Each structure stands twice: as C-alpha cells, then as structure tokens.
C-alpha cells in the first residue's frame, strides 16, 4: 500500500556562533529500501537561537527557515539534495550548514549579534548557541 510515512529527527547543536567561526556542517542521509518512491519533507519543530525560542514566538517552520536567511548576520541553511527519493535503495542527503564571515557586510549587525552571541555563550557555557530539531519525513507516493 502507498502513503506510508517514515520520520526521522535531526538534532543540531552549534556550541558557539561568532564572526569568523569555523563553518558548521551536519548531514543526514536517508535511503529508501522500499518499492515505492517517496517525497522528502523537512520541518523545523524546535529552534532556539541565543536563548530565543522561535517556536514559542509562534513562528512556523517556513518562517524560521526564512528568518535564518534574512534576520541574522550569520547564515544558517537547511537543504535537501532531492525532493524525491526513488525506490529500491536511492539515497537523499539533508544538509544543515552555518557560517558567519568576519565581514558579513553589515558591521552594525555583526557587532550587535557578536556581542549577544558572546554574552550568551559566556552566561550559558553548557548550552548550545543554536539548537534545532528538524523532522524529516519520507512519504510514499
């Protein structure tokens, strides 16, 4: 029967973010051993950036992904190598990457967020600066 859904969760923890940080990269490979192609969907189900819980602020997964593109001096992106994972052993890669160049082009934002990131990490040494939980679903089609 079609329509079966498989779900996996990716937990992303970036200890410290700061201008000039080493780029962060994490990936999850999902394979499809079934006999039916599946559609891959990813959704941010929890997001915490420097102590701000974005889900608690009422942001949707799409809001959060767009916010990562537009609202911060660092870049954080989530992508999938394909929207469809073919039957009989095909593989798809979900990638999470983050970076913060020394010169993002906006010194004021770099300074503001740099200070925030520094203070957060100093005050919360045991907590990740960025923590995400991403649900990846493979839905047979």
Report the location of each language-model feature:
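A surface/secretory-pathway sequence property marking extracellular, secreted
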Residues: 1-3, 41-81
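Beta-strand-rich interaction surfaces with strong enrichment in secreted/lumenal proteins
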Residues: 13-16, 79-86
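Generic "edge-of-domain/loop-turn" microfeature
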Residues: 3-5, 17-19, 35-37, 47-54, ...
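Polar/charged alpha-helical tracts
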Residues: 15, 52, 56, 62-70, ...
